[in-house]
Amino acid sequence: MAHIRKTQNSKHVLMTGVALVLLLLFGLFINRHLSIRALYGDDLYLWSFYGCEDFWSFTFPKVTKGNFRPFYWAVSYLEFWLIGPHVHWYARFNVLLNVAISWVIYFFSRRLSRLTRVPHGMLFGQAVGLLTGMLYLQSHFAAYQIAQVLGLLESLALLLALLTLWGLFDYMEGRGTRAYLCACLCFFLVIFTHERFIALAPLFYLAVLTQYQTERRLCRRFAPSRMSEVPRTSQPPASASTTECDTPGSDMLSGNRLGRLLELLLPLLILAVFFGSRMVVAGEAIPVGTAGTKVQDTFSLAQALGFAFTQVAYIFGVNAGHAIFCGVSFADSARWVQALIGLSWLSLLLMLVLYVRSVWKRGRITPRLIGENLLFICFIALCIGSSSITIRLETRWVYVSYTAALLYLSYMLGEIAKSGRVKPEAGRTVRTRAAVPQRTSMDSVSASGEHGERFGMKKCRTAMVLTFSLLFMAYGAVMTPVEHYDRQHYTNIFFFFDQDRVNSLADCTIDAVGAENFLGKKQVYIYYNYYEMSDFYAEYFYKPFDPEKTGQGTEIHFINSPDELPADATVENSIVLMEHGNRGYIDVSAQTFGLAAWEELPQA
């Protein structure tokens, strides 16, 4: 038996290693076309503070414009320091971070599916976990996370929000206060990363209420009047850790009221610290909205409901927003894409039917089952609601809700994989005598081989698990070409216009001659400035490329004719550019200094 168990563990470790490598390779492949070759907008603005402040001043500024995100700022400072002048590395950094998140999702999905420790279900559990991670990586919602330096903000917030969900799920599964405290820690960090996740606070009270109801149910089930009916020979000797109910229906936490009270107060304490620190640093308790807007001034119930329904549509594969936010709308998508999205709905519907049928056949709806389903549903709903109250809806905010929906499917599979018998949930401090003979009975049934492994699936459930897993894989197979199609239209998203322009600007200047031959040795001149580049860009654009963070005097200047060039400007110390098309530049230095004809320029 020990040899068999060791072999199974070896296979489990091997399959896990293969899955992690596959996720890494898939993440690098799916994002191979995305690059950051220069900083602009909020990316450059944030870097400008890094360029002139130390770690503590950057992380804990005395005054902000309405946001207070010390944890994100600390990680962002470390990112700037780590990458240094290698601006091209930002996109790869974002990709690797997203891969790391997919690893967390992979393990979370395996935990939810409850299959990887079952010999007959290990392959299903590994496959579903891998599929969930891949669906996360290939989602077109990842555009901002990969193609912008501030994608770190969204990725970090998504990761911490999912870890909060994981901690609460483990707590509701009876893994004790440690899981709850881990969830509180992640919640503390996530609200100091992105303010909108304060909306997750009610989930803690849902978890505590569910655990209370579960323990109260156990108290009634294993009351003394019922335990007295158990044969004395099957009762173990009493121990100091044994906790019994005094009367049927009594409070299971009579000996741990202080712990329960602390669990209720801890989320409130975290919120008090959050709002108090905002009052001190930002000058107001209520977080600001998108682009510095005041939520209380811009909020519209009709608009918020519209954004909420739009996010639900996004989760189900329908790009209901404008193309400048999602790349291509559902109405403008190809017919075959619309057909595949319809097939994905069919897969989801069949999975839901299987899940409901499995729960119904179980015959009992426990507080734990209700609470855990509400945990996922409320998590998705709260994430949707918190991102629907501002002035616009961007797909980057849908990413966390979509990922939670994928994990919810893994949870459904895990519930189907459980046997038809409802396993008694053990409270954190409850050790009843009645649970022992029941567990002994379970062991004897398992040993007899009538129903498979101890924690395995009943034979009558194997077909349902297989069917659900195949439907999940079918959903992934159907959505893969859809996501690829959406990714092909990334260039229509609003921030890609400016990113392509600054990438082209870097290509024509510092990347063309090398930083050592450019910084401090050349000046850049741009005709007309139709792209309306600001003076801030002109001053700071090349500083991130300089290890000293100064740019060594190289800046951008705007001219309307060659006559505006300085008298000492030559082709050796100057690069003259002109906007080309709608999102790029071309080098016209030779034409400006009379070394080539203007007619030789390519047409826009």
Feature roles, as predicted:
Residues 105-139, 158-159:
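Transmembrane-helix signature of polytopic, membrane-embedded enzymes
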Residues 471-553:
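Membrane-embedded, lumen/periplasm-facing catalytic core of multi-pass transferases
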Residues 199-271, 276:
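Perimembrane helix-loop-helix junctions
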Residues 40-81, 86, 271, 275-354:
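Membrane-lumen/periplasm interface segments of multi-pass, membrane-embedded glycan/lipid transferases
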Residues 92-120, 163-167, 350-358:
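Transmembrane-helix motifs of polytopic, lipid-linked glycan transferases
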Residues 241, 416-484:
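Signature aromatic-anchored transmembrane alpha helix within multi-pass, membrane-resident enzymes
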